[in-house]
């Protein structure tokens, strides 16, 4: 049978990434407590392609995924090495995006309910392994200006905090979620009874924050972790009384121009 992918290509153009995108795959994630959580991920996986080869072998990417029992940031290097070897490439890349559930107890009733966050692992293996992990966490913000100028009440709304980090040692998703929530006016819960709603409403009112405040508070916490070598933080507030969203962002290493 003719092997079209392995035919010679004479255009002399090296391709940085070739592979498959947005394949939905069942995975098991190792949690901070040592348990496993089953979820469904959207996965992009690729390799580089030499300038003298016409194509890569797409089915081999799925073969690698088919052999993965569980995912953990610490075993991604082994997975990427297998991808690189199977496809005879110099570099390999994988991006895994998935919903992740953290159980939280309501502040007064203590009723536990699952709360979803979006997680991502973005890793590349070339001469060495480079990996970024990230979370998107729903949060609650209350406007300090609105509180200051109003006789009573203040506009408040849901928002989302995004944190992406490079780390010399393992950082758990749960730790990034905790940093996001404690930097906001108040956390978000799936299930709240009336005493819980009263508690959270008053908590946010007593802790007003701009998106700028939330970003800076998150960064202050990340800077306490010497194992974090790089980060990017963005907070978006879905403004309740404006026809726009508000946002602020920062990346470690940015220089003021």
Swiss-Prot record:
Disulfide bonds: none annotated. GO terms for biological process: tetrahydrofolate biosynthetic process. Its EC number is 3.5.4.16. Pfam families: GCHY-1. It comes from the Bacteria. One of its GO terms (molecular function) is GTP cyclohydrolase I activity. It is an enzyme of class 3 (hydrolase). Keywords: Hydrolase. Pathway: Cofactor biosynthesis; 7,8-dihydroneopterin triphosphate biosynthesis; 7,8-dihydroneopterin triphosphate from GTP: step 1/1. It catalyses: GTP + H2O = 7,8-dihydroneopterin 3'-triphosphate + formate + H(+). The record marks 143 as: May be catalytically important. Converts GTP to 7,8-dihydroneopterin triphosphate. Belongs to the GTP cyclohydrolase IV family. HAMAP family: GTP_cyclohydrol_B. This is GTP cyclohydrolase FolE2.
